[in-house]
């Protein structure tokens, strides 16, 4: 699976999205250069301060910085499923990942999982970061920055190294 190739040894920031997209080409870890994923684009825009890189280079840089993305409902697109049913198994997996900070992406994900993660003593940042796929990119960028600062991870926000920048 592509995500495992980009899993950092030490996860500093774990972003928890709702579920994988229906179109596999829109998956966060899809290496297809033509793929477009609103979450991937928005995360890179914040963490790389707007600088562009090809997708594989950006994925490698996210791994180097300790950033990893998982889904609360990892098996298939959500559809009409209740996310609360996925929280207990998710908590078991969280302990094996050992993230320094957890940021929940999307109001439904936050509503379903934040209290349980916090009650389990895991390091969840209590900032409601909207899903960028819902169309509010500006709010996503602001809230993700806020979550990074609250979680003590503001140093993750920095330009790409010169060797990783896209050639224009």
Model features per residue range: what roles?
Residues 1-132:
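A polyanion-binding, active-site-adjacent surface
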Residues 123-168:
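Charged phosphate-binding loop/patch that engages nucleotide di/tri-phosphates or the phosphate backbone
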């Amino acid at each position: 699976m592509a995500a495992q190739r980009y899993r950092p040894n030490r996860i500093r920031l774990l972003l928890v999205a709702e579920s994988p997209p229906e179109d596999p080409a829109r998956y966060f870890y899809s290496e297809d250069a033509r793929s477009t994923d609103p979450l991937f684009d928005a995360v890179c825009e914040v963490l790389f301060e707007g600088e562009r890189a090809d997708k594989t280079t950006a994925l490698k840089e996210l791994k180097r910085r300790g950033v990893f993305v998982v889904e609360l409902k990892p098996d298939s697109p959500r559809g009409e499923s209740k996310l609360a049913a996925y929280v207990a198994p998710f908590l078991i997996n969280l302990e094996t990942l050992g993230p320094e900070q957890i940021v929940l992406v999307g109001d439904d994900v936050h509503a379903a999982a934040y209290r349980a993660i916090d009650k389990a003593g895991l390091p969840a940042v209590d900032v409601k970061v909207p899903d960028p796929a819902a169309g509010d990119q500006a709010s996503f960028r602001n809230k993700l920055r806020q979550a990074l600062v609250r979680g003590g991870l503001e140093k993750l926000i920095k330009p790409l190294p010169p060797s990783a920048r896209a050639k224009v």
